[in-house]
A protein has these predicted regions:
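Cytosolic juxtamembrane amphipathic/interface segments immediately preceding
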Residues: 1, 5, 10-11, 46-52, ...
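Polar-ligand-bearing catalytic/cofactor-coordination segments
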Residues: 2-7, 11, 15-17, 90-91, ...
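Alpha-helical transmembrane segments of integral membrane proteins, especially early/N-terminal helices
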Residues: 17-23, 115-124, 175-177, 215
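Hydrophobic alpha-helical membrane-embedded segments
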Residues: 53-75, 79, 151-177, 250-266
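Hydrophobic alpha-helical segments characteristic of transmembrane helices
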Residues: 86-140, 144-169
Length: 325
């Protein structure tokens, strides 16, 4: 199976899809129409050659994904703001509209920056720092640093699974996870040589090896390996230094995890497939079976940035491409 190199994420009542330097956002509006927005986004990686090196590129790809993802979430949310605000902005015209749009764009940039910074800080605190602080309580009963690090690994996995389980039970998030499933189904559909139709998408798998859920799982696993290995070789006596080192290792951990996900998405190797299974299993929590109207939104997002017919002609020449209606 050849990767299509498309990826995306679910947003509020919609899907973001990205291919190369272009991304689209398709949203099912309250009036049931599908709104599609297409924009260019030049990756940070392409600004300097060194940023495209293995591991390093993973760090900056993660930053890119956070920025684009947050921007698209904020855009999708505008369709579901208070009706009074929505109608007021919709009825603005001329200079007044331009002024309001400029003001909103500035506010959105500030909010996006704060959201990305908070998301990173929250994730590092919850999944990197807190597990160690909890496990370090074992020092009080005479546990060695090696035992504490191993216990930290168990706490980290439990916290991650608990977090995933709890958010999967939230009603609003469940709809997002249904759109997440629709996103995966679209990608699986074309990557398995099927024309991108509602019928074909609905019968495709909602699990995909390049998923962000799998990436997060590998961040957890790689962090465990790094921390156990590092502190076994380099004894660190003070707690604040041990916490600081964990934080400093996060970019490297993210970069290594990205390389594995990249490999998994482009390989049918049995060993890689086996290592991908835990991440795929976690997607049972973070993806749900979508409805047909959600699938229509996902297809619209894909078609806005990706020529799936040309992809099928090149990689699956035996596939019969449906003619334009």
């Amino acid at each position: 199976m050849k990767s299509s190199n498309i990826g995306g994420q679910a947003v509020m009542e919609g899907i973001m899809m990205r291919h190369g330097d272009v991304y689209s956002v398709a949203v099912r509006k309250p009036d049931k129409e599908i709104e599609i927005k297409v924009e260019d986004y030049k990756s940070i990686i392409k600004s300097k050659k060194i940023l495209s090196l293995p591991v390093i590129r993973g760090v900056f790809n993660f930053i890119d994904s956070l920025v684009v993802g947050t921007k698209c979430l904020m855009y999708s949310a505008t369709f579901f703001e208070e009706e009074e605000d929505y109608l007021r902005r919709k009825n603005l015209q001329g200079a007044e509209k331009a002024k309001e749009d400029a003001k909103k764009e500035k506010e959105d940039k500030v909010l996006m920056t704060l959201t990305v910074c908070f998301s990173v800080a929250f994730s590092v605190a919850l999944f990197m720092v807190l597990p160690y602080l909890i496990a370090s309580l074992l020092h009080q009963i005479g546990a060695t640093e090696t035992i504490v690090t191993i216990a930290e690994a168990g706490v980290r996995i439990l916290l991650f699974l608990l977090y995933m389980f709890l958010i999967s039970k939230m009603e609003d998030i469940q709809r997002v996870f249904m759109y997440h499933g629709a996103e995966h189904k679209c990608i699986n559909c074309v990557e398995h040589g099927l024309p991108l139709t509602v019928e074909n998408v609905m019968k495709s798998s909602r699990f995909h090896k390049r998923c962000g859920t799998s990436f997060l799982f590998f961040v957890i696993i790689v962090s465990i390996i790094f921390f156990i290995g590092f502190f076994a070789v380099v004894p660190v006596q003070t707690m604040w230094m041990r916490v600081a080192i964990r934080i400093l290792l996060v970019p490297t951990i993210a970069g290594v995890s990205y390389e594995f996900i990249r490999l998994a998405g482009n390989s049918d190797n049995p060993a890689v497939a086996f290592l991908s299974k835990p991440g795929l299993a976690l997607q049972k929590l973070t993806t749900k079976e979508p409805t047909e109207d959600m699938t229509e939104v996902a297809i619209a997002a894909v078609e806005a940035v990706f020529d799936w017919k040309e992809y099928l002609r090149e990689n699956f020449p035996e596939t019969e491409i449906p003619e334009e209606p």
